[in-house]
Amino acid sequence: VTTIQVADETFVAAAPTTAGAVVNDRARWKRWFGDLRLEVVEDRGDQGVRWRVSGPLEGTMEIWCEAVLDGFVLHYYLHAEPTRPLPSEPAAAMAEVAELNKQRRVAGKEMSFEVKALLEGDREIGGPATPDPACADPASADPGSVRG
């Protein structure tokens, strides 16, 4: 069993095609996961990124952006082992593991809420997903076309 296991998901009401620009921005990685060294194992563009993690933890981490409805679910996974030894006393070791997991869950949630805030912008709660500005304005589409 992996010592550090984090799995989280957040729905982002924004076009899935907007995800890659944010989650693949290396400057943001430093802010989100500053103490970890990240080596890209798989860059999936708008669908996310997979890393090999080193530093205070060794393992794998992933952001997967799954298109759902008119937005996407941002999945965050971290599976890792601490590189420094845990305390030898069982209760202290369990407390340390709990704290390490909490720190990484909080960091993941802060990351996902930042992605959500950036991409949803001033979207009205309950309103349609924020469109991709690079795509044509749906209002300018041919009025005779039928959407299915």
Regions found by a protein language model. Give the residues of each.
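Generic structural detector for well-ordered beta-strands
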Residues: 9-13, 52, 64
